[in-house]
From Swiss-Prot:
Belongs to the DNA glycosylase MPG family. Disulfide bonds: none annotated. Keywords: DNA damage, DNA repair, Hydrolase. The keyword DNA damage applies. This is Putative 3-methyladenine DNA glycosylase. CDD domains: AAG. Its EC number is 3.2.2.-. It is an enzyme of class 3 (hydrolase). One of its GO terms (molecular function) is alkylbase DNA N-glycosylase activity. It comes from the Bacteria. GO terms for biological process: base-excision repair. It holds the Pfam family Pur_DNA_glyco.
Amino acid sequence: MAPTDGAAPDGVDFYDRPVLAVAPALLGATVWHGPVAVRITEVEAYGGLDDPASHAYRGPTPRAAVMFGPPGRAYVYLSYGVHWCLNVVCGPVGSASAVLLRSGEVVAGRDLVAGRFPRLVEADLARGPGRLGRALAVTGALSGTTITGPGPVTVALAGGRGIRPPGPPGISGGRVRRGPRAGIRVATEWPWRFWLAGEATVSGPRPPRRPR
């Protein structure tokens, strides 16, 4: 199913930019696969050959070959033999950069997704990269496919166009937060995780809430 809110998938040029420019611009974007759509609330950037936490750090292995380009493609990998995780390839060909779509809110196909997670509350249906991948029913067969359309997975940016400073289109720059990446063992101090403040779907470590 194509996006139905009037926002079209952005072209390859949007993704042919540095990973730290693309990552926060994906916040608020809507990812479609079939009848299910997820609005992205949390992402992580991975810098390829210069990033020891990246799958591409040691070069173009069979698993990570997709990361080397072209940009605007899905990179889907199996985590711990259990969870399929969805990334978008960005940067010039050969830079091997990608953005992990870490968390989001299910905005279409809720009943279908809830059937996949019968014990979870709505905010948790796509909270975390494993659940997001399962909510969208992605598998390794989608790795390397275009996300700019036409294709099985499409990404429609908030507002439908590329980033306009100070933040993603349709998103107030003041809502975007930045901090260390989660769930990795190296380069843990790099502030390459971005999320939308005030979203219950965000999965990574967050500052404690103020007492009411």
